[in-house]
Structure formats: C-alpha cells, structure tokens
Curated annotation (Swiss-Prot), chain A:
Source organism of this protein record: Neurospora crassa (strain ATCC 24698 / 74-OR23-1A / CBS 708.71 / DSM 1257 / FGSC 987)
Protein name listed in UniProt: Cytochrome c oxidase subunit 3
Keyword Transmembrane helix listed: yes
Lineage of the organism: Eukaryota, Fungi, Dikarya, Ascomycota, Pezizomycotina
Gene this protein is translated from: cox-3
Function of the molecule: Component of the cytochrome c oxidase, the last enzyme in the mitochondrial electron transport chain which drives oxidative phosphorylation. The respiratory chain contains 3 multisubunit complexes succinate dehydrogenase (complex II, CII), ubiquinol-cytochrome c oxidoreductase (cytochrome b-c1 complex, complex III, CIII) and cytochrome c oxidase (complex IV, CIV), that cooperate to transfer electrons derived from NADH and succinate to molecular oxygen, creating an electrochemical gradient over the inner membrane that drives transmembrane transport and the ATP synthase.
CDD domains: Cyt_c_Oxidase_III (cd01665)
UniProtKB/Swiss-Prot annotation, chain B:
Disordered: annotated segments: 1-29, 144-221
Name of the protein this chain belongs to: Respiratory supercomplex factor 1, mitochondrial
Pfam families attached to this UniProt entry: HIG_1_N
Residue runs in coiled coils: 112-151
Complex formation: Associates with the respiratory chain complex III/complex IV supercomplex.
Upper taxonomic lineage: Eukaryota, Fungi, Dikarya, Ascomycota, Pezizomycotina
Protein's cellular compartments: Mitochondrion membrane
GO cellular component: mitochondrial membrane; mitochondrion
Keyword RNA-binding: no
Chain segments annotated as transmembrane: 46-68, 83-102
Taxonomy, superkingdom: Eukaryota
Native source organism of the sequence: Neurospora crassa (strain ATCC 24698 / 74-OR23-1A / CBS 708.71 / DSM 1257 / FGSC 987)
Role noted for this protein: Cytochrome c oxidase subunit which plays a role in assembly of respiratory supercomplexes.
Length: 269, 221
C-alpha cells in the first residue's frame, strides 16, 4: 500500500480534519465583532455598520463550519466513537463555560441584592421599584419551560427507541414551547414598570433574564437544526451527538431558569 | 420578611395602638442581618427549594456522565429525573409562598403602616414650621404697625412739620426703621425656632432638598 492510498484510510479511531478555513475566519470575525461592538457602545460614528458586517460574517462562518461538520459526520462517516467522545467533551466545555458565565451574572445580582446600599434605600427591591409578581407571567413561563423539558425528553426517548414520529413531534412541540416562552418574555419586558437603566435592580434583572433569553433562542436554533436532521434522516437511534448535545443544552438553559426564577423573581421581589 | 411561623400566633389585635408596630421589635437580628444570614434564613424557611435545586443539578450532571459513556437509556432516565426534580422544586416554591402568604402579607402591611407614619410625622413637622413662620410674620407686622401709630401720634403732637425738607427727613427715618427692624428687633416666640432670616436660609433645602430628608427618614426603616 503506497502512502497515497494509505492516506485515504485512517487506521485509527480519530478524525484528522482536512484543512479548513473556518477556524481562522471565525477568529477574525470574533475579533471584529468585539472591537466594533465595544466601539459602537462608545458612540463611535458609523462603527455599527462594521459591527453588523462582522456579525453576518460570524454567522455565515458558523453556518458553513457546521455544514462541514454535518457532512463529515453524516456523509463521510468520520465521526467514530472516539470522535463522538471528543465532541461530547466540547459540548461539556461549552456548557461549563456558560455555567460560569451565569455564575458571574448571579454574583452581580447577589452582590447588589444581599447587602443593598443606602442609595437603594438599604432594601431589595430598591425603593420605588415595583418588581414583577413571580406568580403571574413568570410562573407560566416556568411551567412552559418545564413542559418543553418534558417534550424534549419524550423526543429523546422516541429517538433512542427508533420511533421517528415521536422524535419529530416531541421536537416540534419543544420548539413551539420555546417560541412561546420567548414571546412571553417579550411581553413581560414590554409591560414591566422598570427599565435596564433603573439602577442596580433594572440592570441585574435585564442582564440575567436577557442573557437567559438569548440562550433560549440559541437553544431553540440548536434543537431546530436537530429537528431538521431527524427529518432528513441524518440521525440514528445510536448516533445523534448533535441532538443529545442540544437536549443537554436545553436542560441546562432550563436549570438556569430555575435558579433565575428562585433568586431574581421569587426571593428577589 | 417574617422570621418564622411563631410570629403568626402572637400578632397583637390592635396594630395601630402600638407606638411603632412591628413583629420584630425584640428581634434586632432581623434588622441587622448580613447577606449570609439572609441567605441561610431563606434556606431554613424553605428547605425544599435548595434540595430540589441540588437534585436538579445532580440529575443534569448525571445525564452528561451517561452521555459520555454512550449509555442512552441512562441519559433518558436522568433527563426524566431532571424534569421531575425541577417540577418538585417549582411546586415546593409555590407551596412555600402559599404557606408563608399570611406572614408576608402582614409584614408588607407593617412596612406600609410605618411608611405612612413617617410621612404623617413629616407633614406635621412641616405644618408646625409653617405656623411658626406665620406667627413670626404676624408679630413683625404688629410691631411695625405699632411703631407707625406711635410716630404718627408723636408727629401730630409736635405739630405737623411743613416744608419739603421736613417731609424728606420723615421718609428717611421711616425707611431706616424698616430696614433695621426685621433682623434684630423681633424676638422669636420659640427659642427652638429660628427667626425669619434663618428660615429663609433653610427654605431652599426644605423645598428642593427633599431627597436628603427622605433618605434620612428611610434609613431608620
């Protein structure tokens, strides 16, 4: 066997990727995004056009990169068990970094809420703030998100049992519930009596719930891609790393909501 | 926030009869508790919530560990456990808030009552201040009137002076009197209350600086 022929067969369980432009492309886009984002927050003229260009560039690079990964995993058969373990490791590193990100947000919240300064009236919620009643819309949202956790668990159950319809309907129900949740959060934001500029309370409230909302949207996209891949027969009952990663991410977002609901909505009001 | 249920039974029947109604008059810890105490009090009040949270996180990490092993059945079980644990936590929270509802409602009313009392006290103080000012003003006017009368009597007794020079002299004396009288001559009715100029100096603070006054009254809360 010549080296040329051998290079077509990888006699090891790992995936040695072919040269790809996306890591470099993504790095450049990310640097542009942070730089132009910081500048536009400091009111530099017209810099937000560059920000949008960087954002479009980043989303396109992600799209094309993920497309490559799907073709490698689904059509080229490069995702062996060892590669799947590596991908799983990547998912958990991502989720851990997200968890620490939310830890910082909770830190900011508890720093202000547990020992409220005299400027806030030495009380939390601060004087003059009318917090959202946790047992109105937020409780409904909690139930909706919890139900979406149940439906996505059903979809996972159906997939590993090889029931295509259950997996599809479970995922569709989850995505619908996620969209309803996001819509209700939008309603809550539009009717809230305070804004993000209303002192430590407004800042912490919209900082935490806003970033959670962004994560819900990302998770919805994650699951929507998985839904399409189930529909397109990409996923099997024992090889569905993307779907399981999406479900794990969804459960993570739901757990974050539980902590948000307890500390920001319930105990913090 | 009430400390525990034991306050519920010993609630006084007539709240307004007490000088400063609070269930925590004899509980200095309530007013001085730090962040850690606040958290631990919450956790002790509703212990099911932290238990549910820990169970939820445990199920979530269990799901990841099973996923790493490739054990999809166990992943499924852990996902179910996660949903169940979270549902338990939410139910515990709703039940807890229902259980403490009366306590918390009472506490809220006490806060409101105290706030109203503070506001009323401030209003009374302001009314007293205005009354003192009014009295000072009236006294001043009275004295001026008296002087004017006395002078008119004196003038008429001495015989009305004629000529422009005499009239000018009279007007000058009058003006001089007006200028010198307010500050020094009026004796304040109440030694605690300042005279007119003192009040005027404070006036901008009273009207514009209500923030400081609010802050100081709220600090006591």
């Amino acid at each position: 066997m010549t080296n040329l022929i051998r290079s077509n067969f990888q006699d090891h369980p790992f995936h040695l990727v072919s040269p790809s432009p996306w890591p470099l492309n993504t790095s450049v886009c990310l640097l542009n995004l942070t730089t132009t984002g910081a500048l536009s927050m400091h009111n530099f003229n017209n810099i937000h056009y560059l920000y949008y260009i960087a954002l479009i560039g980043l989303v396109s690079a992600m799209f094309l990169w993920f497309r490559d990964i799907i073709s490698e995993g689904t059509f080229l058969g490069d995702h062996t068990l060892a590669v799947q373990r590596g991908l799983n490791l990547g998912i958990i590193l991502f989720i851990v970094s997200e968890a620490l990100f939310f830890l910082a947000i909770f830190w900011a919240f508890f720093h202000s809420a547990l020992t409220p300064t005299v400027e806030l009236g030495a009380q939390w919620p601060p004087i003059g703030i009318e917090p959202v009643n946790p047992f109105e819309l937020p409780l409904l949202n909690t139930v909706i998100l919890l139900s979406s956790g149940a439906t996505i668990t059903y979809a996972h159950h159906a997939l590993i049992k090889g029931e295509r319809e259950g997996a599809l309907y479970g995922s569709i129900a989850t995505i619908l519930l996620a969209i309803i949740f996001t819509g209700f959060q939008g309603v809550e934001y539009s009717v809230s009596s305070f804004t993000i500029s209303d002192g430590a309370f407004g800042t912490c409230f919209f900082f935490s719930t806003g970033f959670h909302g962004i994560h819900v949207i990302i998770g919805t996209i994650f699951l929507a891609v998985a839904l399409w891949r189930i529909f397109a027969y990409h996923l099997t009952d024992n090889h569905h790393v993307g779907f399981e990663g999406g479900i794990l991410y969804w459960h993570f977002v739901d757990v974050v909501w539980l902590f948000l609901y307890i500390s920001v909505y319930y105990w913090g009001s | 926030m009430p400390n525990s249920t034991d306050n519920q039974g010993s609630a006084p029947p007539g709240l307004s009869s007490r000088p400063l109604p609070s269930s925590f008059d004899d509980n200095a810890d309530f007013y001085n508790e730090n962040g850690f105490q606040k958290v631990s009090r919450r956790l002790r009040e509703e212990p099911l919530i932290p238990i549910g949270c820990i169970a939820t996180v445990a199920a979530f990490t269990g799901a990841y560990r099973a996923m790493r092993r490739g054990d999809h059945e166990q992943v499924q079980r852990m996902f179910r456990a996660r949903v169940a644990a979270q549902a338990f936590t939410v139910v515990a929270m709703v039940a807890g808030s229902w259980y403490y509802a009366a306590d918390r409602q009472k506490q809220k009313e006490l806060w409101k009552l105290k706030e109203q009392q503070d506001a009323e006290e401030k209003r009374q103080k302001w009314i007293r201040e205005l009354e003192v000012r009014d009295a000072e003003d009236k006294a001043l006017q009275e004295r001026l009137e008296k002087r004017r009368k006395k002078k008119a009597e004196r003038d008429s007794a001495a015989g009305a002076p004629d000529g422009v020079a005499a009239q000018a002299q009279a007007a000058y004396a009058d003006a001089k009197e007006k200028v010198s009288s307010p500050a020094g001559d009026v004796a304040p009715e109440d030694p605690n209350k300042s005279n007119i100029t003192g009040v005027r100096e404070r006036l901008p603070t009273w009207l514009g600086g209500s923030k400081g006054a609010d802050g100081s009254s709220r600090d006591k809360n």
